[in-house]
Amino acid sequence: MNIEDLVWKHALANAVRYGGKADVKAVMAKLMADAPELRQRAREVKQLVEEVVAKVNAMSPEEQLRILRERWPDALEEKKAEQKRPGIEGLPELPGVKDGVVVRFAPNPDFVLHLGSARPAILNYAYRLKYGGRFILRFEDTDPRTKKPLVTEEVNAYNAIREDLRWLGIRWDEEYIQSQRMEVYYDHARRLLEMGAAYVDLCKADEWRRLRNQGKACPHRDQPSEAQLELWDKMLEGRFGEGEAVVRIKTDLAHPDPSVRDWVAFRIIDTTKTPHPLTGDKYIVWPTYNFAVSIDDHLMGVTHVLRAQEHSVNTVKQSYVFKHFGWEQPVTIHFGRLKIEGATLSKSKLKSMKIRYDDLTLPTLAGLRNRGILPEAIWDLILSVGIKPSDSTVALANLYALNRKHVEPIANRYMFVADPVKLVFEADRELVAKVPYHPSFRERGERVYRLGPGRVELYVQRRDAAAGKVIRLMELANVEVQKIEGDVAYGRLHSLTLEEAKKAGAPIVQWVWDPVEVTVIKPIALGKKAEERGLGERHLEKVEVGAYVQFFRYGYLKKKGPLEFVYLHD
């Protein structure tokens, strides 16, 4: 299939899946995943994608579907193809699966996604692929005070999360935003108050805490439903201020965990002071996490919940809402924390740093993407950890090793010399070097260098140019370094073949002729980068921005700008 047909296929498939509007970034991500060799031509391909997406989005949904069915019916069977993703079939079976699963990924948009939050997203989606069913994206944004959704000129967390998920190859079947569902929560709160399963508490916080710790009911708990509904209406009307009234779910006042005892379902937040970025000051009575989650999991038909062990108490709290309504609670699987050695996954710490959320030194998905980590490597890491209940600690080196596996086939090889010295020697004949772009993919071609006869000048690393040492100039010749004067090394042509180099114990070194200045950016810590400058071969000018390369004896890199590269790993 030619490139244009491939772009049309993915643009139409993306539009059909998402209500008639294709997304350029999503189509690019799918293209690069399916045809990694196109990464070397990213700029050219993106221009084509933009043109095709504009044409696709101008069509009616019916026309989009018709063309897709006629030309690429296989795209409508995406689920079957996705199920072939390596590692999915090896996941442990989930209990209680009937006709597929309904799972959800429910981020709080108070920050962007990081490596840790990729775990529930990938695991839930992986099980949706394994069994079939539905994957729900639900933004849990009902705390505009302490976990205010992040919407600024620099970043809109809602959109950033969507972009991160698309980059991971995750495609949701339904999307909900809890702050847009307030009337649903109000309706269910009223029903619970009418049933006598909830009540409006007017106690002071310290008085409630004392009663709770003693396992005693507050004086408002057993008031008739009529009185409760009257207080509820006053809450909605703004007759109470922050902290003056809350709605509590009736649980077990003797429960061994005091936090479970009659937990708060609704509280008052003065949105004239802390407006919600989507709803402003329209609402002042806000559902807590546990209440909104309970209602939504039932109404959305969630069958299985996969989430971190830290939510185990929340599962207990939510069970009371399900019992009061007579609903079946989803099967819940708790997995341990994922700790990454060498990376900070704390939202609060990452948010406090005065650097962009997509800075390539951060373990945010946007930061990892900018650095050059591929989504396939993150999938491999998360699936290797799985859903075990114990905490898991992995080193960033593990992620780099997995990334190397995916980058190696697509990274063409180039020569780069850090800390260069000029090497000068005389050649009694023409020396020819044929350097393939990739040793395993000879069809990508090679560049040919012809040097000599006569004086030859090229550049090698200072550490390779020790006096009295024979070195093998990769694919070119063997030279004995005779002396070094400042930044110039002088040598003599020793021999020509690799076999002769081996006999002389000569190391193979990279070299550069007719060089260009190259800058390498090296992430060294959160918010900290180092720059290394050196000389590279002129062919690096033709490498597309965003393409992956390997510098011989140096490591893998991603091109960031004109002759500027980001170091990934060795």
Curated annotation (Swiss-Prot):
It is found in: Cytoplasm. Pfam families: tRNA-synt_1c, tRNA-synt_1c_C. One of its GO terms (cellular component) is cytosol. GO terms for molecular function: ATP binding; glutamate-tRNA ligase activity. One of its GO terms (biological process) is glutamyl-tRNA aminoacylation. Its EC number is 6.1.1.17. Keywords: Aminoacyl-tRNA synthetase, ATP-binding, Cytoplasm, Ligase, Nucleotide-binding, Protein biosynthesis. A motif ('HIGH' region) lies at residues 107-117. SUPFAM superfamilies: Nucleotidylyl transferase, Ribosomal protein L25-like. The keyword Transmembrane helix does not apply. It catalyses: tRNA(Glu) + L-glutamate + ATP = L-glutamyl-tRNA(Glu) + AMP + diphosphate. It is an enzyme of class 6 (ligase). Catalyzes the attachment of glutamate to tRNA(Glu) in a two-step reaction: glutamate is first activated by ATP to form Glu-AMP and then transferred to the acceptor end of tRNA(Glu). Belongs to the class-I aminoacyl-tRNA synthetase family. Glutamate--tRNA ligase type 2 subfamily. This is Glutamate--tRNA ligase. It comes from Pyrobaculum arsenaticum (strain DSM 13514 / JCM 11321 / PZ6).
